[in-house]
Curated annotation (Swiss-Prot), chain B:
Complex and partners: Tetramer of two catalytic chains and two glycosylated inactive chains.
GO BP, one annotated term: protein catabolic process
Catalytic site positions: 308 (proton donor/acceptor)
Cofactor detail note: Binds 1 zinc ion per subunit.
PANTHER family: CARBOXYPEPTIDASE N CATALYTIC CHAIN, PROTEASE M14 CARBOXYPEPTIDASE
Protein species of origin: Rattus norvegicus (Rat)
Name this protein carries in UniProt: Carboxypeptidase N catalytic chain
InterPro entries per record: CarboxyPept-like_regulatory, Peptidase_M14, Peptidase_M14_domain
Tissue spec: Plasma. Expressed in liver.
Keywords: Carboxypeptidase, Disulfide bond, Glycoprotein, Hydrolase, Metal-binding, Metalloprotease, Protease, Secreted, Signal, Zinc
Signal peptide limits: 1-23
Catalytic activity, as annotated: Release of a C-terminal basic amino acid, preferentially lysine
Main location: secreted
A GO molecular-function descriptor: carboxypeptidase activity
Length: 565, 457
């Protein structure tokens, strides 16, 4: 009886607990799913901002504070021309996933001491175009992952020495366009992995000697647009990895002989727009990897012999806008890879015959705006790859025959602004232009003389216009064989001898062969309106023209015909 | 080289001694940062402004270069470059960012050619008209084979098929009489176009642009108007034909300026296609309606060409430097062309500026109008022309002008108030061009009134 009672009771107890448990589980699951959906759906974009996946752009000029409701999944936030003026302590601590924070031309002028605290993953921080002028020493102290810091175009006048002391991972530091006058000597001491340092457009006049001594990884250093008159010896001595150095637009008057002596990796050196008047011969002797050198707009009067001896890899060299009067013969002897050489806007009066001899890879040569009067016939020989040659704005009256004979690729030759004398000595040039150069490039190249050709376009000249009075037009030799010789060859040559008769002013020219005359050129009055009067109607004029063949008399008359059909 | 105007004189290649720029692709945030950097670096000659927003809300930023940025100086022409109209065609975007950095850097280096250009020209650079499409293309990565991914805007619309179609109206007017310039917009145009198109239209109506280029990819050729074939409606859509504008010779010259200054465009053989001189009439290549370059010509004073710049629409980062070196001289020379032709002031007897005066050139069936400051600009090739200025209520004036190779030629007009009391006669359009009814615009207000009466085109 007891056994039967116990058995009956047990099944009854098992049923009720199972059912409520199942119901509770289902309810919990539904509740969880609803919460998930709600969270996702209700992630709002902060007012005044635009959201693109994990990036936020806040461009509302009325945005008066950093939003407190930045979604937590956001990695990039950019503020453009917003109006809040302060970044408060730990302003972004609710967004621990941020890797990029950018302020562009905002009104921020105050960064609280721990403004960027709570951003362990921040890699890229930029505050640019803002009116803030100072930073507290520990403002960046918690940014352990930062690789790129940009503080361009603010009003920073001074930087605390410890500012970058905990930024071990920094690779790029941009401080361009501030008002820095001096820098503490140990400012960059901790930046062992820095690759790019930009201090351009500040007011720096000097650098402490040890300024860059920790920057052994530095590849690009920009010091352009400051007020350096000199750099201390040794300031660059630890920059063995440096590839590009910008010193342009300063007030540098001289370079110490060993300033660059440790820059063994340097490829590009920008020294333009300074006041360098003298270069020590060893200035570039350690720069064996140099490919670009810009010395434009300095005050160089001479180049020391051997200046570029140790730069065999140089590809582009500019010496324009200096005061060079000539270039020593061996200056470029070792620059066998040079592709571009600019010597324009100097005071060069002559060039040694072999100065360009070894520049076999030269493509572009600029000699414009100098005082060249005569060029040696072999000056451009060996320049078989030359494509562009600028001789404009010099004092050239002619070019020697054969000067371009080995310049097979020359298609762009600039000649304007020279006082070309368009007589027989220009025959080579005009023939060459007709064959090899597109006349469109010389549409402003005019003759300066002789008087009757002044103002004529050089490329449009005909060969027979290029004559020298008193000389045979075709042959360069007087034929001295006695007349009456039985030698047919001599007789044939004599029969084709041409004489050019001319008057002293060069206004009347007559081309004749032995038995007849072929053309007559008369300039009745000078283009300059000189005192020579033009011929009137119904008048005649007579000239006696001379050449080495003798003299002839030419009479020209002009008769006005009665009007008729 | 074929015969080309003497404007090629400054063909000496720009020096390679320029500060190197970073050659990389720019996503939207990098584009904004780069533009702000250029503006901050050259604050006295630049202005950064936006003309509107894309579908997704990205700003269409424009960087202006001028010696007085933000101000139109009378007789100083406005020019524009537009890039990245198709989001996946990205070289134009990168070139325009490089050009911005280059102009700033060369200005600071006191490059005389660039100094003169910035002093005499007001340059507007819109690196990306389709920033949403760009992000779609960039997300694919430059090596994927998706040919059209990112071409359209976020609404799936091809922006170079989205402008009001004024070609049909012009072709009709050429035949039966009617305006040959500043064709009106339909009343409901704003509801017909995408936000990016609307922003650009409002932009080009707000400034009196004279010259323009918009940049694409997929070919290497300089394309000039018309894009829409004159014969399209009457022949098989598969046949294309040359469809010249009244300024065909001028447009060919503008296109040749770019192609011959380019490193290799002029060779003609590019991307497996051949275009003589590296140029093509748009319609003779293939016809397209509602394009931006035709709209510029038909609705405004602006002469626009379309530059196809690279075979690969989204070139690899490593190719960008070569592309920049190949395009740099062309980008500068093309801007310099805005100084060809004639320009001047249109004034009344009391030396007040006349806005909306019509400048006609005999033999060219396309007029231009004077701007809000009374100045006008008419691009012309070297030659001798008969030029007439007309304004409502004033006696027309005609002068003979010789345009030289170095321009522009200054030609001012002073118009006397008309003393004739003839009432305007309402004529039905007659046959032939001689009876064309010109509608000079003396003020925007009057133009609005005229548009309301006329109704949709």
């Amino acid at each position: 009886m007891k056994f039967s009672s116990v058995s009956e009771e047990k099944p009854g107890l098992l049923a009720p607990p199972a059912q409520p448990l199942t119901k509770m589980f289902q309810g919990a699951w539904l509740c969880w799913a609803s919460l998930l959906l709600l969270v996702r759906v209700t992630q709002p974009c902060p007012v005044g901002c635009d959201c693109f996946d994990r990036k936020i752009f806040c461009s509302d000029e009325q945005l008066a504070a950093i939003p407190l409701d930045i979604p937590s999944h956001v990695t990039d936030i950019v503020f453009v021309e917003t109006s809040f003026t302060t970044v408060g302590t730990r302003a972004f601590s609710g967004s621990p996933n941020l890797t990029k924070v950018v302020f562009l031309n905002t009104r921020v002028h105050h960064l609280e001491p721990d403004a960027f605290g709570g951003l362990p993953r921040l890699e890229d921080l930029e505050v640019t175009g803002s009116p803030f002028s100072n930073l507290s020493a520990n403002i960046f102290s918690n940014l352990s992952s930062l690789g790129k810091l940009t503080l361009d175009f603010n009003r920073l006048a001074a930087l605390p020495e410890d500012l970058f002391h905990h930024m071990d991972t920094l690779e790029s530091l941009q401080l361009q366009g501030n008002q820095l006058q001096t820098l503490p000597g140990r400012l960059f001491q901790s930046l062992r992995y820095l690759r790019t340092l930009n201090l351009a457009q500040n007011l720096l006049t000097q650098l402490p000697k040890g300024m860059f001594q920790s920057l052994s990884s530095l590849q690009i250093l920009k010091l352009s647009d400051n007020m350096f008159a000199r750099l201390p010896e040794g300031v660059l001595s630890n920059l063995g990895s440096l590839q590009e150095l910008f010193l342009d637009s300063n007030a540098i008057t001289e370079l110490s002989p060993h300033l660059f002596s440790h820059l063994l990796s340097l490829e590009k050196l920008w020294l333009q727009h300074n006041a360098i008047s003298l270069l020590p011969v060893s200035a570039f002797s350690s720069l064996r990897n140099l490919t670009f050198l810009n010395l434009k707009d300095n005050a160089l009067r001479t180049l020391p012999a051997g200046l570029f001896t140790h730069n065999p890899g140089l590809l582009h060299l500019s010496l324009s806008y200096n005061q060079l009067e000539t270039v020593p013969e061996g200056s470029f002897a070792n620059l066998r890879k040079l592709a571009s050489l600019t010597l324009s806007h100097n005071a060069i009066t002559h060039l040694p015959e072999n100065v360009f001899r070894n520049l076999e890879q030269l493509v572009k040569l600029s000699l414009d705006s100098n005082n060249l009067t005569v060029l040696h016939p072999t000056l451009f020989h060996n320049l078989s790859k030359l494509q562009l040659l600028d001789l404009s704005r010099n004092q050239l009256t002619m070019l020697p025959g054969g000067i371009f004979d080995t310049n097979y690729d020359l298609f762009n030759l600039a000649l304007l602004g020279n006082p070309w004398q368009c007589d027989c000595r220009l025959s080579y040039l005009t023939s060459w232009l007709r064959l090899y150069n597109d006349r469109i490039f010389n549409t402003h190249t005019f003759c300066a003389g002789p008087a009757y050709l002044k103002g004529q376009l050089v490329p449009n000249l005909k060969q027979e216009q290029l004559v020298c009075p008193g000389n045979p037009g075709q042959l360069g030799l007087d034929d001295r064989e006695p007349a009456g010789s039985w030698d047919l060859a001599v007789e044939g040559r004599a029969a084709h001898r041409q004489c050019i008769y001319g008057n002293p002013e060069g206004t009347v020219l007559l081309a004749c062969e032995e038995a007849q005359c072929r053309w007559l050129n008369i300039q009745l009055s000078s283009r300059e309106g000189s005192d020579v009067t033009a011929m009137a109607y119904n008048s005649s004029q007579e000239w006696e023209l001379r050449s080495t063949c003798g003299s002839v008399r030419v009479t020209v008359s002009i008769e006005a015909q009665a009007a008729g059909p | 080289m074929p015969d080309l105007p003497s404007a090629f004189l400054p063909l000496l290649l720009l020096s390679k001694f320029v500060t190197p720029v970073t050659f990389r692709h720019h996503r939207y945030d990098d584009l904004v940062r780069t533009l702000y950097k250029v503006h901050n670096q050259c604050p006295d000659i630049t202005r950064l402004y936006n003309i509107g927003r894309s579908v997704k809300g990205r700003y269409l930023y424009v960087l202006e270069f001028s010696d007085y940025p933000g101000t139109h100086e009378p007789l100083e022409p406005e020019v524009k470059y537009v890039g990245n109209m198709h989001g996946n065609e990205v070289l134009g975007r990168e070139l325009l960012l490089q050009l911005s950095e280059f102009l700033c850097e060369e200005f600071r280096n006191r490059n005389q050619r660039i100094l003169r250009l910035i002093q005499d020209t007001r340059i507007h650079i819109l690196p990306s008209m389709n920033p949403d499409g760009y992000e779609v293309a960039a997300a694919q990565g430059p090596n994927t084979s998706g040919y059209l991914v990112g071409r359209n805007n976020a609404n799936g619309v091809d922006l170079n098929r989205n402008f009001p179609d004024l070609n049909t109206y012009f072709y009709y007017n050429s035949k039966y009489g009617g305006p040959n310039h500043h064709l009106p917009l339909p009343d409901n145009w704003k509801s017909q176009v995408e936000p990016e198109t609307r922003a650009v239209i409002q932009w080009i109506r707000s400034l009196n642009f004279v010259l323009s280029a918009n940049m694409h990819g997929g070919a290497v050729v300089a394309n000039y108007p018309y894009d829409k074939s004159l014969e399209h409606r009457f022949r098989s859509p598969h046949r294309t034909s040359n469809s010249p504008t009244p300024d065909d010779e001028l447009f060919q010259t503008l296109a040749k300026v770019y192609s011959y200054a380019h490193g290799w465009m002029h060779q003609g053989w590019n991307c497996g296609d051949y275009f003589p001189d590296g140029i093509t009439n748009g319609a003779s290549w293939y016809s397209l309606s509602k394009g931006m370059q035709d709209f510029n010509y038909l609705h405004t004073n602006c002469f626009e060409i379309t530059l196809e710049l690279s075979c690969n629409k989204f070139p690899r980062q490593e190719e960008l430097q070569r592309e920049w070196l190949g395009n740099r001289e062309a980008l500068i020379q093309f801007l310099e062309q805005v100084h060809q032709g004639i320009k001047g002031m249109v004034l009344d007897e009391n030396y007040n500026n006349l806005t909306g005066a019509v400048i006609s050139v005999t033999g060219i069936n396309h007029d231009v109008t004077s701007g809000e400051h009374g100045d006008y600009f008419r691009l012309l090739l070297p030659g001798t022309y008969s030029v007439t200025a007309k304004a409502s209520g004033y006696e027309p004036k005609t002068v003979t002008v010789t345009v030289g190779p170095a321009g522009p030629t200054l030609v001012d007009f002073q118009l006397k108030r008309s003393t004739t009391q003839v009432h305007p006669v309402q004529k039905a359009p007659g046959r032939g061009q001689g009876s064309r009814a010109k509608q000079p615009r003396t003020s925007r207000k009057k133009d609005q009134a005229a548009k309301r009466h006329r109704g949709p085109a």
